[in-house]
Amino acid sequence: MSRSDHSLSIAAPHSGTLDGSQKIALAVASMGVLVLFVSLPMGTVPHAGLWLTGALLAIALGGAGYAWRTYAHHPAGIKNNGVWHNGLTSRGAVAWVLGVLLTGFYVVLYFYPQYLGLGGDGKANTGTVALFDPLSRLLSGNAASQWFVYGTLYTVAILSMGFKFILKYRHNKYEVVRTTSVMFFQLGFAFLIPELLARLSLPYDDFKNMWPLNYYFFDEWNVKGMLDAGGFGLFMLLFGVAMIFLISPILTYFYGKRWYCSWVCGCGGLAETAGDPFRQLSDKSLKAWKIERWAVHSVLVFAVVMTAALVYSYLGGDSAKGFWVTRGMLLGIIVLTLGFVVAVLLIRPGMVKEVHKAVRYGAMGILAVIIGLTAYAYISGGSDIFFVQSYPLRNAYGFAIGAIFSGVVGVGFYPLLGSRVWCRFGCPMAAVLGLQQRFFSRFRITTNGGQCISCGNCSTYCEMGIDVRSYAQRGESIVRASCVGCGICAAVCPRGVLKLENGKPSGLVSSDPIAIGRTGATLR
């Protein structure tokens, strides 16, 4: 006998009830999670490899089965019906419970790994960490750490939720290819390759994770480790530098920051897959936008200052310390970089006019202070640029930004603040790519304002908090530093108003003189 439907909605939103297949799939996934929890208080885990294999397969297959039953048997098309009536996706009780659990997990992961079973002082692992020992020894030859546990679960989450995302957006080729790319880079470059490098006694390195997101790349121990690894280590060092100063700017020029934030980055990969149900929770207010601009660029300044101070502290006055770069050469690199920025601004003065006066003066003041303190430290022969020891500064950055902001808040607050909190307010890599995209990239989202019906879907589902509808209503192209080019705004638009395109960089800053909007054509 069929279940009666008491809803009078024409849209037929999800009623919240599950069919038998969905219940079985969720039960299977829950059993996998239960194995992880049960292993917590255990000393040694018998048959750990068998239990771990069963748990991970249960989580992955259960999640995939639920997604298949939810989306595969319905016509292709995006269905976000009832998201504001679901406790999980509208900051309800379930969302708050999940947020607390995620936040608590990250606190334990970063600061109390012993409660997960991490063995210290040469002791063997116990509990959940011991459960992952067989897989870790298979890949790297070493016992598991809390970071291996986290990386494994992180990868499983992106793969299983990525499969769900592909089913949901299967009619959109751009979303399918983009999500497949994220899944590939997470599994291959972020998980498997670094573990295999460790097995070969080579430095552990995620090739796609570049500075300033990888804030320890220029740490002395990391640089020495790569230099001591021979030719391959030298390749890793040069490739990392090329990613920062050559590969990233070129790709951003042609494709915008989406090439990294939506196609490659692991943080963005988790936000796009596991965080997809929460994208509508991003704050679109003007106040949030102002906080975003100051916060993310302040973190970038902090990262640059911290890195410069750290590198300067371990470089010698000559090459006797084993590095190719001396303090004098570092000072020259800083001066040349700033000179290049000034030259670009002189060539394209229109960019400066688009920046608020307070920001311009603040940036010039910070640059002057950095140059002055660096020159003073070099002339006086001191080892600390900013009159503070560099490693405590580095540790403060790692604690506040690398742990609290990116992990505890960035992922723990998914169900409450949306999936891109870290990307919007704290990621220094997003800040660098955003500046390049805003002023030097060919990428933009074009609008056909005459077709806009002001439904607001684009703004609602923008995970970066951009009020896309306001641009569409005025017929303006969207060129925002924060846009990650996920394409969801174009995908949810019922009228085909938005389109991801490339154009001439000269037309990015200044608006078109003629705007075609909802009220007709107007002259600016």
Residue ranges of model-derived segments:
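Cysteine-rich micro-motifs
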Residues: A481-G487
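Non-ligating segments of multi-cofactor redox enzymes
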Residues: M1-E476, A481, R495-R524
